[in-house]
């Protein structure tokens, strides 16, 4: 494992500990495509899918969250999402019973929100929960550099994320729905 990988694992563990997530519930996949150590990662392969599938079979989750914001310049988020969805498709073809009680939710990153008409689940965030989300993001110090690939937005990642969550809550308020500090929106992925 690279130094970068060790640092990012430590940051992820710190964020999980901050949010009272037991470390025995944290899984690092070590996907083969990701371990190429380069900015341009290797292509996703069946080996990546098998790693994800093995974890899904072990955990049998009721909810899975995948990146729906696929404008990642390195393609990492898209490859991870593709590996998860391919593993789910293989499990579905195999008749996995656990999938009957599982929902797959797609989230967006800090740059864009789902269109209001496409949102299928919205989780309200109190001021304290929004602050906890910010603090969790800030635990990932090695990833705090700017990301200019989606325009000239100079705000930091956590600022964009908070502003996006607050804007979603404001939109729901304008529609006459309950008023919250912020809201995190999701779209459900439904395997064919």
Predicted stretch roles:
Residues 1-97, 135-139, 153-159, 167, ...:
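Active-site beta-strand->loop->alpha-helix modules in alpha/beta enzyme cores, enriched
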């Amino acid at each position: 494992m690279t130094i970068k990988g060790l640092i990012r694992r430590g940051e992820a563990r710190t964020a999980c500990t901050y949010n009272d997530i037991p470390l025995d519930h944290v899984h690092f996949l070590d996907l083969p495509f990701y371990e190429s150590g380069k900015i341009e990662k290797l292509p996703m392969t069946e080996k990546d899918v098998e790693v994800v599938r093995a974890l899904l079979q072990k955990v049998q989750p009721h909810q899975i969250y995948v990146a729906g914001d696929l404008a990642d310049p390195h393609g990492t988020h898209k490859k991870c999402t593709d590996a998860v969805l391919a593993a789910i498709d293989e499990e579905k073809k195999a008749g996995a019973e656990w999938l009957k009680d599982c929902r797959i939710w797609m989230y967006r990153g800090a740059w864009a929100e789902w269109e209001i008409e496409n949102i299928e689940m919205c989780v309200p965030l109190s001021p304290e929960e929004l602050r906890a989300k910010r603090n969790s993001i800030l635990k990932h110090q090695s990833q705090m550099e700017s990301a200019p690939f989606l325009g000239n937005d100079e705000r930091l990642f956590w600022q964009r994320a908070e502003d996006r969550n607050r804007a979603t809550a404001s939109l729901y308020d304008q529609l006459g729905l309950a008023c919250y500090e912020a809201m995190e929106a999701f779209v459900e992925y439904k395997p064919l």
